[in-house]
Amino acid sequence: MGVTIKYTNNLGGSIEFSNASHIYISTIDGLSSNDISLSESDVINGVGTINTGCTISSKQMTFTGFFTKDKDIHARLLAVILPGVGGKLEYVDTDNDIDVFWEGTPTSTPTFGWREQYTENFQFKFKAFYPYARSNQLYSYSFLETNTTELLPIDLTT
């Protein structure tokens, strides 16, 4: 099946980027990187500094893609990826069992250009305020079916 990317805005509009929709993502910049800022402090009578903490910044992703020239797809991209309206960006890779999402807001609505005679390029930017992907897959663990000695191997009765 491959990779499917779906964007759903907070108003309920959605658009899918996949082989089935004939809207293709060719590159995603910023998908796997995180910007980290370190806080440092000087040490009295010491050499160098010590790390006192770090901040992991929000994630900025740039999506570039193309589609067969179609005014309906063009209009749908503009109708779903709206300025000032947040949403959920889902990334599903069935070949590698990945089903994750980010919540955020577009920082650039789609821009368009010509790719070839019958195809059109597009690009938009999305900022996820929480930089890590979250799983769409629900995991549950039943404590009713678990032997308590597996959880606490220490005898607490003494």
Q: What role is predicted for each listed range?
A:
Residues 1-158:
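Extracellular/virion structural assembly segments
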